[in-house]
Structures are given as C-alpha cells and as structure tokens.
Amino acid sequence: IGKATALHFAANHWNVIATMISLDEGKDLQNKPNIHCYLLDVTSTESIQTAKEKIVQDFKTIDALINNAGIGYRSFVELSEDTNIKSIVEVNWLGVVKVSRAFIPVFRMQNHGQIINISSIAGLVNLPLGSFYHSTKQAVESFSECMAYELIDFNISVCTVQFGNAATNFQSNVTKSPTSGIASYDALMKKVTDILHKKTAKNTDLTPKITQKLLS
C-alpha cells in the first residue's frame, strides 16, 4: 500500500516524501519523478527526529502525513512471545504515535495539515489469532480520534483508513506462532490462515481503490 500510494500521489504531481527503514527497499522509487526517499525507523525516536529535521530543511511546507508502517502477528495468546508482542506494538501503534508527535509542531506552525493513519477493518472487528494485531489497530483508532479533537483549532485534520485484505505481500510476511502439537490450535491456525489468504487473493482491485481514495 505504501509504495502504491507514493507512486499514485507522485503521478498526480505531489512532492512525495517516502520514508523507509532501509533505503535499499526504495531503490525502485529513488529515480521516480516527484519522489524523495528518506531513512526513517518508526520504532526509533532518534531516527524519526533526524528524518524530520532533514525533511523540514528540504521542504518549505508539509501538507499531509500518512502513517502506513505495519506488521502482522498471528498467534494464540498462550503461545505468544514477548519479542513479537513488543515488535507489533512498537511498529503498529507506537510508530504512529511517535511519527505523529514529531510532525504535529510542523503542522501547528503552518496552521494546516492532515494526518492519515492507515488502520484496518481489524480495528473494528475481531478474529481469532488476532489478539495482538487487532489490539494495535484498535489503539490506532482511539488514538486518532482523541488526537483529532486536540488539533482541530490548528486546522489539522486526522483520519483513519480501514480496509480489508489487499493483494499485497502482507499476509505472506505475517509472523505466526509455530505448530503447537495441540490439535485444536493447529486446526484453527490452518483455517484462519487459509481464509485470509483466499480473501487476499480475491481483492486484486483493492490497492488502487485505496490509493485513489487517499488522494481524494
């Protein structure tokens, strides 16, 4: 979604500031017209601040911020691991918090701006094995609504975008708890994984619909 959004906005003559945890990931974007790539790790306050300072130096104004970074973790609560829980919270929720917090002063001084947080239908409905992913997306929903009330006097709008399984590599990259040897758990893991992959494969037209909606 992030790459498709960057390309769509750039094609519509926006200056796109594309941030990523490794610039190697953005090699195919670096020579595209209107796209400017910056190193930024959403889990690192220092990295966010460094990127922000460079971006503000390079551009006079910033009109919109899209928080898109996200990872998945499909696990039973009993089998969950602290490191994986920490990772999904740091990326999916605290990443949104930290990046938003960094750029709010820029928008406030400009007296305009828009913060768009990519959430998910998972922020509204729940599925088994999604205890941690759904929790982070629901946190983004609540955080965004509260922040919107705080920033309205500064002409800064905040919204979330909730969509289902887009045809990206997200599902393939989801971290899953290992086979447990518990028949009920293993059967449910297979069932949920199969359903999500099938839904993802069907939604081939969802990504362009999302990018078009963001631009509007």
Indicate where each model-derived feature is located.
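Canonical Rossmann dinucleotide-binding motif of NAD(H)/NADP(H)-dependent dehydrogenases/reductases
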Residues: 1-17
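Residue(s) in the substrate-gating loop at a strand-loop-helix junction
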Residues: 120
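Substrate-binding pocket helix/loop in short-chain dehydrogenase/reductase
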Residues: 76-77, 81-86
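The beta1-alpha1 cofactor-binding region of Rossmann-like NAD(H)/NADP(H)-dependent oxidoreductases
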Residues: 40-50, 82
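A short, exposed helix-loop element centered on a Lys and neighboring polar residues
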Residues: 100-101, 145
